[in-house]
């Protein structure tokens, strides 16, 4: 089927040339579907039919004399210039010619040639429709992942690999675990389609390079050791770590005495978003420095890191840009492993503070916190604020990290180190000019610091010497009296629209706030994290900023992260993706369910980092510290039943409880004791620790048999079984399940792709995906779904296994 064109003799538009009625000779033998290509009434059906026959004869000669049925010929009538008409034979026709059964349709060839030809024609038609889908506005990253995973056609896979460049970076980043898992475990055609995009993005972003290197290592660990060494994933990981994907033609950023343009900008007045201009900047800026072979830090690199740099010319080459960050992460992981050997929480906490104090001697450096969503440099870890979290066998810990936000991580100079005793506390940025420090001086504070492209120097900046910033002493008698609220006052004064609030409302809200301020937890040696987690985040930020030598800088930010050693976070990452997808679906369908997915960084098959949920403590900590029921705690924190604060917190509780009940049902989340359910300051509940999902359960006992955890205490907060909020809860459950099943494929494909080549416990058994699909109940009517929700809610409330599991956790781990 080439692109043969037949140009029939021009026709005179006479009255006889109009098509006859159905059933006349040739009137129904040709049915042509056109889309905006002209009128068909100017062509006599008999002439058109004869032209079709001529085309078929030519095609028959081209195919070696094989007779071709006109039924299967993808012919399309095209009006080219509005006057002359032509019939064109297309390889990829947008529509098919349908003809009635007649003598011509009966003339068909026999044998294998006919079957092969029909297969080619069918494939051609399918590819035409597929191309239309790929080029339509409906084609999103979710569809691309589905076709990339399910299609067996190399052409389709290659096309989708190219289409990845058209999607937003954020959209593709969400599916990065799926892309890399397919690259590792699927056939070569899929890998070839994916690799150009991965390489391109690694050249653009150092954070993307780190994510790829970590995930490739983690997902390759399920392979046999002999296969793993020579796998595509291992080779790509070595390529990334060897720094061969570092942006080419980067120019060295020379030290300048002029103020750095990004230092004087307030990061709060701009939104950080990667774009093509950012990528261009990261490619065009930076430098190539000569590595000194005598550097003991380079010579003592671990075996893995040194093996990744074998291809680099030691005499003159760019330093490995990922080396400082990997060293920083390795230091945090080593601390966690050493803490696990200590017997008591108190000893672990003391050791953690000492270890982080030593770590501070290497900061600031060209390192960053991968869980953050903006470019920055780490400058300090307030070591006295770190806490060890509850764990029976391991020692996960929570740290706070001070960073300075920047426009571009690669090209911005590493901030100079400010000693703890070189600065006096200043409580607001706006008072600095009055205290003798002008805006220009602050903007240029770090302008004399060179760009640390030699990352070994950037990581070990102990001997800063002359680069340290000397700030004049500040007299606190005039500066410290300036309130931080002055910024808010100025902002409100700039508003042109008057805001009218009734005096009675002001008095009522003030009295409620004074009467029901959030309570503080008492310090518990067995649970040191409770006090730290209960403190409001904004209060913690203010307190740490006041005591930090970097706190006066306008681009100062405080981040937090949980470091975990000895735990496989790949299942946590899978759960995060499913929660994020469900959150997007419910927002799209306008169902007011509330869930809080938190970021996961997989470092290896047994370590990682987790983004903490701020302003939240576990229900176990709430009950242990307050010695109150959940409802009484709500009344203590938010006021009486009729207050605005209580009603708002109750609504938040219901919306979040319904959302997480659906999550727990769809993913079959287990190990739901009160230590794994958080309660935030606004009344939401947040489930954490998704180590047991789908086919796995604690100790493989399958102890928790209810669809989700719904205790009597939860129902009491909702107002009881007869309350309006409890009915609202069940209505949200139904709406959420209906919305989720409309987009079932988006959820299922996330899990299905990650099952490829995986040895994770959640995929044990051959029916994991089938059971997941069945829980969406695609064949049920909405009335049947409503009955199902009623049954699940009733069964979960009355579940004896939930009560037994809570009792088991109390007896073995002391979890209330």
UniProtKB/Swiss-Prot annotation:
Where in or outside the cell?
A: Endomembrane system; Mitochondrion outer membrane; Rough endoplasmic reticulum membrane; Golgi apparatus
- Highest taxon of source: Eukaryota
Q: Which residues form the PIK helical domain?
A: 52-242
Q: What is its EC number?
A: 2.7.1.67
Q: Which GO terms describe its biological process?
A: inner ear development; phosphatidylinositol phosphate biosynthetic process; phosphatidylinositol-mediated signaling
Give the intrachain disulfide bonds: none
How is this protein annotated for GO cellular component?
Golgi membrane; mitochondrial outer membrane; rough endoplasmic reticulum membrane
Residues that the record marks as modified (Phosphothreonine) are 263, 438, 517, 519
Annotated region described as G-loop, given as residue ranges: 541-547
Reaction(s) catalysed by this chain, per the record, are:
a 1,2-diacyl-sn-glycero-3-phospho-(1D-myo-inositol) + ATP = a 1,2-diacyl-sn-glycero-3-phospho-(1D-myo-inositol 4-phosphate) + ADP + H(+)
- Where Phosphoserine occurs, residue numbers? 258, 266, 275, 277, 284, 294, 428, 511
Task: Indicate how activity is controlled.
Answer: Inhibited by wortmannin. Increased kinase activity upon interaction with NCS1/FREQ.
Which residue intervals make up region (Activation loop)?
687-711
Region feature Disordered, mapped onto this chain: 1-30, 248-318
Composition-biased stretches, type Polar residues, lie in 278-297, 306-318
Free-text function comment from the UniProt entry: Phosphorylates phosphatidylinositol (PI) in the first committed step in the production of the second messenger inositol-1,4,5,-trisphosphate (PIP). May regulate Golgi disintegration/reorganization during mitosis, possibly via its phosphorylation. Involved in Golgi-to-plasma membrane trafficking. May play an important role in the inner ear development.
Could you describe the subunit structure of this protein?
A: Interacts with ARF1 and ARF3 in the Golgi complex, but not with ARF4, ARF5 or ARF6. Interacts with NCS1/FREQ in a calcium-independent manner. Interacts with CALN1/CABP8 and CALN2/CABP7; in a calcium-dependent manner; this interaction competes with NCS1/FREQ binding. Interacts with ACBD3. Interacts with ARMH3, YWHAB, YWHAE, YWHAG, YWHAH, YWHAQ, YWHAZ and SFN. Interacts with GGA2 (via VHS domain); the interaction is important for PI4KB location at the Golgi apparatus membrane. Interacts with ATG9A.
Give the UniProt family note.
Belongs to the PI3/PI4-kinase family. Type III PI4K subfamily.
Which protein, by its recorded name, is this? Phosphatidylinositol 4-kinase beta
Q: What is the organism lineage in this UniProt record?
A: Eukaryota, Metazoa, Chordata, Craniata, Vertebrata
